A protein has these predicted regions:
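Feature captures the FAD/FMN-dependent oxidoreductase FAD-binding
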Residues: 76-144
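Small-residue (primarily alanine) positions within well-ordered alpha-helices
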Residues: 14, 18-23
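Fold-independent oxyanion-binding glycine-rich loops
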Residues: 11-12, 33-35, 46-47, 54-55, ...
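Glycine-rich active-site loop/strand segments that organize a redox cofactor
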Residues: 47-97
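Residue-level preference for short coil/turn positions at secondary-structure junctions
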Residues: 2-4, 25, 139
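Glycine-rich FAD pyrophosphate-binding loop
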Residues: 7, 23-47
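Beta1/beta-strand and adjacent pyrophosphate-binding region of the FAD-binding site
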Residues: 1-14, 30
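Short glycine-/acidic-enriched loop or helix-start segments at secondary-structure transitions
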Residues: 18-19, 41, 136
Length: 144
């Protein structure tokens, strides 16, 4: 089995962002996705257009007992960082009513670009792959 520095469980939006970020930092990275392809749920976001961020991200946009939980996250990686990352990947925005979409207005283009970036960075993409267990070992974790 190949030694991997980072294993990301799930090849959705968050998983792909995590994998790209880890690989850009030099980590040998693998994504394990149970669906037959990465980014499948991304295809339905924004009515198939992939609304990837919003101009307004105040606390009123979040529900739950503690909407302030998002503040430390946005301090580290906010809306401007998201737009910059997408532009670095070649995904330029089309803004409608404060919602950011790829200029193509096609969610599939976002999935394809993240797939190409993963390939470029050498990220192992395992699809149609069920996860049975994660065991802590003395040197890390064993995933089966």
């Amino acid at each position: 089995m190949t030694d991997i520095d980072v294993t990301v469980i799930g090849g959705g939006a968050a998983g792909l962002m995590a994998a790209v970020s880890a690989a850009r930092c030099g980590a040998r990275t693998r994504v394990i996705e149970h669906m037959d392809r990465i980014g499948k749920k991304i295809l339905s976001t924004g009515n198939g257009k992939c609304n990837y961020t919003n101009a307004v991200q105040g606390l009123s946009c979040y529900r739950g007992e503690n909407p302030a939980f998002v503040l430390p996250v946005f301090e580290q990686f906010g809306q401007e960082d998201t737009v910059r990352l997408f532009e670095e990947l070649g995904i330029y925005p089309k803004i409608k009513n404060g919602y950011y979409y790829p200029a193509s207005e096609q969610a599939v283009s976002v999935v394809e670009v993240f797939g190409m970036e993963c390939d470029y960075l050498g990220v192992d993409l395992w699809t149609s792959c069920g996860l049975q267990s994660i065991q802590k070992t003395c040197t890390g974790y064993e995933i089966s």
